[in-house]
């Protein structure tokens, strides 16, 4: 398969994720869209790594997945704390936590 197709797929996935972050107000959906954007970047890194014949892109993608796993733990804990206090996962309700 042509490597350009993987780049187009990566750009499409990143665009869908960015649109989801900008258009949705639910924290869980926004969180999943951020993860989609990270996976799109990983796909691009691995594709560039394969095109150039080096392992640098794959190493970056691996460390990005490690950071994303840590982000999942912290992000879901924050979302659950917001849900427990406000009984809603809306981002607008998270603004009220500072009072």
Curated annotation (Swiss-Prot):
Enzyme class, spelled out: translocase
Assembly: NDH-1 is composed of 14 different subunits. Subunits NuoA, H, J, K, L, M, N constitute the membrane sector of the complex.
Biological source species: Mycolicibacterium smegmatis (strain ATCC 700084 / mc(2)155) (Mycobacterium smegmatis)
Highest taxon of source: Bacteria
Name under which the protein is recorded: NADH-quinone oxidoreductase subunit K
Topological category with respect to the lipid bilayer: Multi-pass membrane protein
Main location: membrane
EC id: 7.1.1.-
PANTHER family, alphabetized: NADH DEHYDROGENASE SUBUNIT 4L-RELATED (PTHR11434:SF21), NADH-UBIQUINONE OXIDOREDUCTASE SUBUNIT ND4L (PTHR11434)
Transmembrane parts of this sequence: 3-23, 28-48, 59-79
